[in-house]
Amino acid sequence: ALKDEFEEHAEKAKTLPENTSNENKLILYG
C-alpha cells in the first residue's frame, strides 16, 4: 500500500512547478 501511495504522490509531484524544491515536496507529501 505504501508503494502505491508513494507512486501516486510521485505522479502529483510531477505536476508541481519545476521550482518546487525537494524539501517542499517532502513537506507536501512526506
From Swiss-Prot:
Binds medium- and long-chain acyl-CoA esters with very high affinity and may function as an intracellular carrier of acyl-CoA esters. GO terms for molecular function: fatty-acyl-CoA binding. The keyword Transport applies. It comes from Digitalis lanata (Grecian foxglove). GO terms for cellular component: cytoplasm. Residues 1-15 have a biased composition (Basic and acidic residues). It is found in: Cytoplasm. Residues 1-30 are annotated as: Disordered. This is Acyl-CoA-binding protein 1. Keywords: Cytoplasm, Lipid-binding, Transport. Residues 2-30 form the ACB domain. Belongs to the ACBP family.
